[in-house]
């Protein structure tokens, strides 16, 4: 009986050792997987925060763009209305100018007949084109400065 007891004891010890090894192996795997899960959860949280921040910035940039695009469109519309009013004669374009006097032989001496000051049509078009480009440049510059101050901090 002692031999049977020794074999059974050896088998029980082998089973206990094998079970201990298996438990230790699966415990190590559980610890490793838990660490990986925690690391991935932190990375996911950071990624979600970055996505939220980017979406907020995109909304801010879109609002900023819409604001300055509207201001630019309003300024261009105002410039076009001014151009149309000047062309139709409802408004006058005042520019400091000096008119050359025209002397007529039949007029009394010392009296000058001055010609009415007026821009040439090309100069008038150039004025409004320049004004429109200045407005565009100003609005683009304001929008860029606002973008840099708000988004590139």
From Swiss-Prot:
The chain crosses the membrane at residues 4-24. Its main location: host cell. Pfam families: Phage_lysis. GO terms for biological process: membrane fusion; viral release via disruption of host outer membrane. One of its GO terms (cellular component) is membrane. It is found in: Host cell inner membrane. Residues 1-3 are cytoplasmic. It is a single-pass type II membrane protein. Residues 25-153 are periplasmic. Keywords: Coiled coil, Cytolysis, Disulfide bond, Host cell inner membrane, Host cell lysis by virus, Host cell membrane, Host membrane, Membrane, Signal-anchor, Transmembrane, Transmembrane helix, Viral release from host cell. InterPro entries: I-spanin. Residues 65-92 form a coiled coil. Component of the spanin complex that disrupts the host outer membrane and participates in cell lysis during virus exit. The spanin complex conducts the final step in host lysis by disrupting the outer membrane after holin and endolysin have permeabilized the inner membrane and degraded the host peptidoglycans. Host outer membrane disruption is due to local fusion between the inner and outer membrane performed by the spanin complex. The coiled coil region is probably involved in host membrane fusion leading to lysis. Belongs to the Lambdavirus i-spanin family. Homodimer; disulfide-linked. Interacts (via C-terminus) with the spanin outer lipoprotein subunit (via C-terminus). Part of the spanin complex which spans the entire periplasmic space. The spanin complex is composed of one homodimer of the i-spanin linked by intermolecular disulfide bonds involving two Cys residues and one homodimer of the o-spanin covalently linked by an intermolecular disulfide bond involving one Cys. This is Spanin, inner membrane subunit. It comes from Escherichia phage lambda.
